[in-house]
Amino acid sequence: MLRDSLKSWNDSQSDLCSSDQEEEEEMVFGENEDGLEEMMDLSDLPTSLFACSVHEAVFEVQEQKERFEALFTLYDDQVTFQLFKSFRRVRINFSKPEAAARARIELHESEFHGRKLKLYFAQVQVSGEARDKSYLLPPQPTKQFLISPPASPPVGWKQSEDAMPVINYDLLCAVSKLGPGEKYELHAGTESTPSVVVHVCESETEEEEDTKNPKQKITQTRRPEAPTAALSERLDCAL
């Protein structure tokens, strides 16, 4: 009985271990497949390549040009070429990004007419909408009416009434009664208190400055007198 129970327990443990290993292998293989699919996603790659430092014969000799184009037609039948002779570059346009990637991997730094081909992906042209999505957007203008007033005021807004200006009429009355060189009685005297009188006088500093630095008077330029010789000649002619 004990042997049978031990044997059955060992068999159950082995079955559990094998099932756990199978689940782990399935999880690992599933993750690897997902990672490979992400790695093989070539939709973001450009469909054009640039061949740099191309031999001059490709631009001048038709046979060399056809040989050069034949290297890339193996990957895509609809491939087109744009030759830039002054820069010694050729733009190769494929119909699919997969073909461009294969050509880049297999033909980069391969020899052609005694020189190594340098193949580089062309820059992907990003549209305006996609470019805007790649940056952070400004916050939504929910409560920006204090920064710049809207066309219509917000709900519950009321215009505040301006307060009346504070005017000291007593001060204005006292200033209006003042005159040049006259005295002004602030408080009238009583039997027990003297009166308060203000006398306007010139400051001593202004008088000292006037004596030290007198103002210069501009003398008017005198009109020049007519020469006597010219007057005598005129008198002789008149006589």
Curated annotation (Swiss-Prot):
Coiled coil segments of this chain: none
Residues covered by region (Calcineurin-binding): 183-203
GO term, biological process aspect, one: calcium-mediated signaling
Region (Disordered) residue spans: 1-25, 202-239
InterPro entries: Calcipressin, Nucleotide-bd_a/b_plait_sf, RBD_domain_sf
Comp. bias regions, Polar residues: 7-19
GO molecular function: nucleic acid binding; phosphatase binding; troponin I binding
PANTHER family assigned to the protein according to its UniProt record, in alphabetical order: CALCIPRESSIN, CALCIPRESSIN-3
Function of the molecule: Inhibits calcineurin-dependent transcriptional responses by binding to the catalytic domain of calcineurin A. Could play a role during central nervous system development.
Family: Belongs to the RCAN family.
Assembly, per entry: Interacts with protein phosphatase PPP3CA/calcineurin A.
Name under which the protein is recorded: Calcipressin-3
Lineage of producing organism: Eukaryota, Metazoa, Chordata, Craniata, Vertebrata
